Amino acid sequence: GNKIINKNYGFHTYDSLIKVSENSIYDVASLTKVTSSTLSLMKLYDNNLFFLEKPLSYYLKTFKKTDKGNIPVKDFLLHKTGIRAWIPFHETTKNEDGEFKKKTLSNKYSRRYSTHLTDSLYLYKKYKKEIYNHIKETYFVDTDSVLYSGLFFYLVPEIVSKLSKLSFENFVGDIYSSLDLNKTLFNPLRKFPKNKIVPTENDDFFRMTQIHGVVHDEGAAMMDGVSGNAGLFSTANELGVIYQTFLNDGYYNGKKIFNSSTIALFTQCNYCFGKYHRGLGFDKPLPEYSIDDCTYSKYSSKKSYGHSGYTGTFVWVDPEYNLIYIFLSNRVYQTRENGKLYEYNIRTKIHDYIYESFLK
């Protein structure tokens, strides 16, 4: 496709030392859910290894005796299970007095404490099991309504690994490699210096340091930076390649990456009742547009789909207009209390302007 606008504004931080560029690497937060998790499940669906109607326990046997085990995975992707939205996993490491529990965290790396949170904070290497246990035991808010929840996406890496016989990171990494991407990855400090990566937040409640080059989401950090709910880093251009492949019916540079029928299935409205319209993993336009409830443009077609991210990221694809809109920011810098992106509705206004540039 042709780029309508490709602009970069501002600096990595308020000291104005490093300008933002098209090569700046961002923590894309919940865009991970569609750009890694859903993407991987689509590939497995293509390969007849992943089945939407199968229950969660079909893929993860440890959930067999839980109240989540019989729920079809399709319902998790549609966010229609009623399971709670999230669990503050970082708080599970603390006692009631706010102090860290013994045998949970250490200020030094060792074989036992090998999950890197900061250079002076390491998590017990098997704590992922505790995260899974919390998900198994957590409650449902309302089983009769759609409630956005990120908890299933913590489980996607294990599902992908079991089905593909590869680690989640390697499996989705192979998809990125087939698209010639090299800045779309987890734990980017393994490959890039900090000055290529935009920092997110100055954490003053858990990791007690600037979060820079490691995932902002606390739960994903506790999964060693590789999770299905958050953890992916990328650039606007590389995200554009992924979603242009969607608009190209699964093709990239003449190579078939996905079946067009799979793209159509996952991005169409699979749950369209009342005020809830959802694709498989993807957000869809609401039946009635509301500036207070919608990040996407009022001009978006019913065929459009996308997702937003907590750190100030957004992707929206509109097949009717052959349009991809990608917005990356570090809106949580220096603190997540920074709400100006929402207050001024910046993402949506830019999206409107883009549509207006060719709809006139």
In which residue ranges do the predicted regions lie?
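Residue-level preference for non-acidic, small/hydrophobic
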Residues: 1, 33, 37, 41, ...
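Active-site-proximal beta-strand/loop segments in catalytic clefts of secreted hydrolases
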Residues: 1, 9, 79-81, 283-285, ...
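A short, well-structured edge-of-sheet supersecondary motif
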Residues: 1-19, 117-125, 182-184, 315-318, ...
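Short, conserved catalytic-motif segment at the N-terminal edge
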Residues: 1-28, 49-51, 210, 217, ...
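Short active-site loop at a secondary-structure junction
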Residues: 15-76, 138-152, 227-230
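Extracellular/periplasmic catalytic domains that process cell-envelope and extracellular macromolecules
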Residues: 19, 66-70, 140, 273-275, ...
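Short, surface-exposed loop or secondary-structure junction motifs
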Residues: 68-302
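Structured C-terminal helix/loop/strand segments within mature extracytoplasmic catalytic/sensor domains
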Residues: 307-360
